[in-house]
Amino acid sequence: MIFLAGFLILNLFSTVKAEPILHEKYYPTGNGPFPVVIALHTSNGYKTVRKSVKGFLAAGYAVYTPDFFKRHGITHKNRFETWTKYREQIEKELIEIVQLAKSDSKINPNNVFSVGYSNGGYWASFLAAQNYVNAGTSHYGVWSWPRTHNGFPAKYFSKDSNPVLALHGDKETVQELRWVEPEINKAAKQSFKFKHRIFTGVGHSWDCKPCKKDGFNSDVTRQALDMTLTFFEENTVK
């Protein structure tokens, strides 16, 4: 149990498959119960999600950050298997994390949200589209991939889906808009609660300072967080 900058961080390490996947919990100051965000990492691994935690804590949200790679030995090299070979297993593991959060005495079980970045954007969409969380936001999320694409995450959506906000850039070199846009349109056709915003002149990983390919963009990083917080507030049970 570690206290850091006024926030309580609990590190939970799963050693057997009967336990939930590796995850960390972060709580804002106060007694709660708090709304919670399930924050989901990129294909560069679990460490990439940690930079997003501070903004949600400052807004009064607890944060759960599951590592959906470690148990399956997934790396950047075999990342496509996240959505094919291991898809159904990861679905179950993330549902279990949501259930764990809802059973946490510090959490308000009526207000659970998801946010994901790149690979994690796929899973944030899954959790909301399949009604496991109140709403989800996908930041430069995965909507398509070469050779083995199976129609997901667009296939998760239906007329009964909970709200999802997809944020994407029109200068993407990883999840190029020409491949993503048809999938976004499919999701929008299936669910009237699906919304999306395309940022002009913006590429992939806009919140990642070390990422050189598409470039860090502090303005879009801030705007994306603000839009996400507003979206969650709109879907909060009072």
Question: Which residues does each PLM region occupy?
Answer:
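Short amphipathic alpha-helix adjacent to the substrate-entry channel of hydrolases
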Residues: 48-66
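The feature captures the conserved acid-bearing segment of alpha/beta-hydrolase catalytic domains
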Residues: 135, 141-198
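C-terminal catalytic histidine-bearing segment of alpha/beta-hydrolase fold enzymes
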Residues: 193-238
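Short beta-strand element of the alpha/beta-hydrolase
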Residues: 33-42
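Alpha/beta-hydrolase fold nucleophile elbow
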Residues: 106-117
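Alpha/beta-hydrolase active-site loop
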Residues: 83-104
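Cap/lid segment of the alpha/beta-hydrolase catalytic domain
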Residues: 48, 69-88, 205-211
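Gly/Ala-rich beta-loop-alpha elbow adjacent to hydrolase catalytic centers
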Residues: 116-120, 124
